[in-house]
A protein has these predicted regions:
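Secretory/extracellular carbohydrate-interaction modules
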Residues: 48, 84-149
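Short tryptophan-centered beta-strand motifs in secreted/extracellular beta-sheet-rich domains
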Residues: 43, 109-111, 172-187
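Beta-strand-rich interaction surfaces with strong enrichment in secreted/lumenal proteins
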Residues: 95-102, 162-168, 210
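Short, aromatic/His-centered strand-loop micro-motif at the edge of beta-sheets
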Residues: 154-175
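Ligand-recognition surfaces built from glycine- and aromatic
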Residues: 37-38, 202-229
Length: 229
């Protein structure tokens, strides 16, 4: 075989292009991956008993700081879950675990969550277009109230924009989804669309976070983020 022919050089060019593309993607980090499509948070690779890697922690409202950890859970898809363990009963207290290096306006976020315990609340949710700990949208499910609600949080104050009342069973995994496209927000629960909301308060790109309330001990699994055009 003649190694100097045009087919040979075409093959070499293709291989080099593939290697270069893979190298650029690997070196670009989480932001580049998020901009090109879907990421799934690798909870199964996180260290048990430690704070979940790739997240920054904050709080809306009053009360003590949250306690986020990686917990062993054989019912989780990878045997581990992200858990908020603090039982501070301050009612207007909303712990946030903000995913690092991701900013998007249009996206689809899905999680599995399990409400483990809580006297004041047993809630878990997703925050999007997060500017800071006091300004964002959030959808949350509550096992004590058997409902799902969508809020905007402006300067630390919540305002409900939509809701539905499905059964939210404690100590059982449920799926919660939020799709944000421009002014339209679509909320899904256990694979079914619940309701839609129109709002223009936060139009710019912002962060994505896991969210809980008050003394909720909540576990999170299968966090998937898909950026949209």
């Amino acid at each position: 075989m003649d190694g100097s022919g045009p087919k040979f050089f075409s093959l070499i060019d293709s291989v080099l292009s593939m290697v270069l593309a893979a190298s650029l993607l690997a070196s670009a980090g989480p932001r580049a991956l998020a901009e090109t499509g879907t990421i799934m948070i690798a909870i199964g690779q996180m260290k048990l008993g430690s704070a979940p890697t790739g997240f920054t922690f904050a709080r809306t409202g009053k009360g003590g700081e949250a306690e986020w950890t990686v917990a062993e859970d054989q019912t989780a898809s990878q045997g581990r879950a992200i858990e908020q363990t603090s039982t501070d009963r301050t009612d207007y207290r909303f712990p946030l675990a903000i995913h690092d290096s991701l900013s998007a306006a249009n996206l689809d976020v899905e999680i599995r969550f399990k409400a483990v315990a809580g006297k004041i609340d047993q809630a878990g949710g997703i925050a999007v277009r997060l500017r800071d700990a006091d300004n964002y949208y959030v959808v949350r499910a509550n096992a004590l109230e058997d409902n799902v609600r969508f809020y905007r949080v402006v300067q630390g104050r919540r305002e409900q924009l939509g809701g539905a009342n499905p059964k939210v069973t404690p100590n059982q995994w449920h799926k919660l989804g939020l799709r944000a496209e421009g002014e339209r927000f679509t909320v899904s629960y256990d694979g079914k669309m619940l309701f839609r909301v129109i709002d223009r308060t936060f139009a710019e790109a912002g962060g994505v976070a896991l969210w809980t309330k008050a003394d909720s001990v909540t576990r999170f699994d299968e966090m998937t983020i898909t950026t949209l055009p």
